[in-house]
From Swiss-Prot:
ATP binds at residues 213-220. It comes from Enterocytozoon bieneusi (strain H348). GO terms for biological process: nucleotide-excision repair; transcription initiation at RNA polymerase II promoter. Component of the 7-subunit TFIIH core complex composed of XPB/SSL2, XPD/RAD3, SSL1, TFB1, TFB2, TFB4 and TFB5, which is active in NER. The core complex associates with the 3-subunit CTD-kinase module TFIIK composed of CCL1, KIN28 and TFB3 to form the 10-subunit holoenzyme (holo-TFIIH) active in transcription. This is General transcription and DNA repair factor IIH helicase/translocase subunit XPB. A motif (DEAH box) lies at residues 322-325. One of its GO terms (cellular component) is transcription preinitiation complex.
Amino acid sequence: MKENSEDCPLWINYDGLIILEMFRENSQQATNFLIAIAEPISRPENIHEYQITPYSLFAAASVGLTTDQITNTLQKFSKNIIPRNVKNLISDCTLSYGKLKLVRQSQKFFIEVYNDKIFNFITSDEILKSFIVNSNIDELKIEITNVEKIKKRCIEIDYPLIDEYDYTAYESVNMIKNLHIDLKPSCHIRSYQEISLNKMLGNGRARSGIIVLPCGSGKTLVGITAISTIKKSAIILCTSAVSVEQWKQSILLFTTINPYSVSRFTSDCKEWFENYNVENTSQGGILITTYSMLSFSGKRSYDVQRIINKIFAYNWGIMILDEVHVVPAQMFRKVVSSVLHQCKLGLTATLVREDDKIEDLNFLIGPKLYEANWQDLSDKGHIAKVECSEVWCEMTAEFYREYLIQDTSKKRLLSIMNPVKIQMCEYLIQKHEAQGDKIIVFSDSVFALKEYAIKMKKPFIYGPTSQTERMKILKQFQINSKINTLFLSKVGDTSIDLPEATCLIQISSHFGSRRQEAQRLGRVLRAKKRNNPNFKAYFYSLVSKDTEEMHYSAKRQQFLIDQGYSFKTIIGFNDMYYNETRLYKTKQEQKELLFNLLSKNLSSDETDK
C-alpha cells in the first residue's frame, strides 16, 4: 500500500481487475483515464470495476497513449503498487502496437513493417506467410480477401495492425470521390459525442473502430458527423428497412447534403445516387442499405444485381456499421470484407453477445474507441431516467398443473399466455395510458403478440407487416393521441426511433439475452419528456412466477445492472382486479384459454425470421 492510499480512488488487482471508488475526490479524473485503457465491467453508483486487457491496451495505444503515460497515471491514482505482471502486460501491448500498418493503394493492400527484426518475424510466421502475395524491403502485399484473417493473426501474435485512413492525402483526394456535405449551423453535438469522435478522427486521419453509446444518446449523429468530417462517399449498413429510412431522415435533417446524393437500397426501394448526378460524375454520395440485402446469396433480379455489382465495385471512403454487434454472425461478416472501403466505424449500445464472437470485432472492425457511462448521461439529462421493475405473475392452479407436465415448448407457451400475466399487462396499459404515457409492449412470441394485441384492440407490428404498414403505424403512434399503445415483436428491438415512448412492457423475450434486454430498455431512453422536472420512464418485465422465465430474467438483467440500473420486484397491485371487465377474469374463460393452448400445434417461441 502507498502512504497516501486513503486518498487514492482505485485498487489494481494482479489479474488486471481495477476497483474504482467513485466517492473519492479525484474519482472523475480516474474514470476519464480508465475509459481509455480498460474495459468497463460494472458501473453501479459507488464502486466501478474495470478490466485491463490486451485489446483495451491496443485501443489506448491507438489514440497515442504511451507505456510510461499509462503506468505513471495508474500509479498516481492507485492505492497499491502496480503488480509486476500488470506492468509487463502494459509494456508488451503498448510497445508492440504501431509496428505494422495496413496501407491501401488504389485497390491494393500492403503491410508496412517497422524494422527488419519484425519483418523477419512476420515473414517466418507460417500462417501469415500463406497470405503474403509478394514482399519488398519494408512492405508485404496481401489480397483484400485475406485482410480479416491477417488482422486476426496479427492480434494473436501481439502485433496488431494500425488501420488508419489519411483522408487528406493526395491519393485519397483523387481516388475516392468527394462528398459535398457539412453539418447545418443549427446542429450541435454534445460533449460526449465530441469526445468519441476525437478518438476516431485527428490530424486528417480516421481510425477504424467502435463507439459504444446508449440507445437514444445520438449514435446516428456521431456517424453523420464522421461522414461530414471525412467528406468522402459513404456506405451505411443497418439491421432493418425502418432503420434505413430513419438514417436518411437524420442525414437530411442534420446536414446540407443534396437529397439526390443520398440513396436507399432495400427490398422496397432500390436507388443509386450516381443515377441522379449524371452531370457531375466526380461527386460522391451516401448509400444506406441493410446487412441482409448485401449478404443474400440467392438469385436476384437484373436491376438489383446491377446495383449490387456497383456497390462491391465502388471505392467507399467510410463504412458505417449500425448495431455493429451483429457483424460477427457468419452471414454478415463477409459483407465487411467484400465491400471496398478505406475506414469503418461501428456503432452500438450493447457490445455484448451470448456467444463468444464479440471479440472478433477487434479484427473485423477495430478496437473499441469509446464507451459512454449510461448513468452519467442519465444524470445530465441526455437520456431518460428509468424505473425498472420485474413483475411476478402468479400462475393459476390449472395452468401451473399443466406447466409441470408439458414439454419445453408448451411450458413456454403456458408461461407467456398465463391469464394473470395477460391481466397484469392489461392493467399496466390502462394505468399508464391514463397517466398520458405512450406504451410499447414487446413479445418474442408472435402467437402471444397477436393474441394480446387483438384482445386489447391495439395495433401490432411483426415480421410479415409490410414496410408501408410499419411506417404508417409508427407515424400514428407518434402523432395520434388516441393511439397510445403499440405491440412489437423482436423486429422492434433495434434501430426504431420512437422518442414519444415513455413506458415499456415486456411479456416474452429471447431466453437470457442481455443484449435484447438493454436494447428494449433503449426504446424509452430517448423519451422527449426526459428533461421535464421529475420525469421518469418505466420498464416492466412480466414473468410467470416459479417458471423458467424467472431464471432467464435474472440473466437478462445483468448487463443493465452492470450499467448501474436496479430492478425492483412487484408481486401485484391492490387495485388490479377492481375492473369487472378484466380479461380472463372468470374460471370458465381461463379453462377455455388453457384448452385452446393445449390443442394448438405450435410453440411459444414462434418468432420472426
